[in-house]
Every structure is written in structure tokens, then in C-alpha cells.
Amino acid sequence: MKLNDIREGNYVKEFEFSSRGRALEPFYRVKYDDLGYWHFMVGIPITLEWCKTLKMNTEIVIPTSTTRTNYDWIAEAPGIRIIEYNKAITVYHGMGGVKTILEHIKYVHQLQNFYYGYWGFEIDEENPTEFYKEPKNE
């Protein structure tokens, strides 16, 4: 299966260092607001509901007169952070060899030994636009 990655031209490599001065893996920052639509792959929109479906940790800012944040909502999972601010999506991830969110999810599942089970859905590799489906009970 060929996955379409549409990040070209919207992607810079950044490096971050820990407080101990130890270099971390390359950290990639991707801005999608100038594409007109925000996808990791064709057919998969990045929205707050999508992040909740993936069981990512999410936080929504409730606007008040004293709210001073630089995001409207934020979603995090191991190795990835997604931020929306003023209707622009910014994605940060530290998986250097991973080119699409499908590969990232597989990587995280394998790392945590949760592949096709813990999160309660399976990745439909035949049709990646149908990103998740309920597992079949046999």
C-alpha cells in the first residue's frame, strides 16, 4: 500500500536538548495551515474529535477574560503533540523515520505492545481513508 505524504515544503527539522544537555532525537515541526486542509495523509483530517478517537490526552482552553494561552486545544500521545491555535494546526513529533500518522500509530502500538487491541480499533490498511474501524469479534 502506498501512503500519500503531503508534508513537502511545510516541514523543518529542529533539535531540542534536555536539561542535562543530552541531545534528543530530531524533533519535527509541521505547519498545515497554508495547505488549505490539515491532513497527515490524504483523507484523514486532524480534528479534536479524531484525536479523542485515538485516545490521545486532550486539553481544551475555555476562553475567559484572564485566559492567556497560545492554543485553542492540544492533544498529546507518546512522541507526538498536536496544537490548534486560531484555526491553524501545528504538529510536533519526534519519530524521525516516520512519514505518516499511520506509521506513527503502528510504531506507538508496537512500542507499547498494544497493537490492535488496547485502543479498541484496527487500522484499515486496505483503505486508509477509513482510518479506524471497530475490531471484528470472532
Where does each model-flagged region fall?
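Structural boundary micro-motifs
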Residues: M1-E138
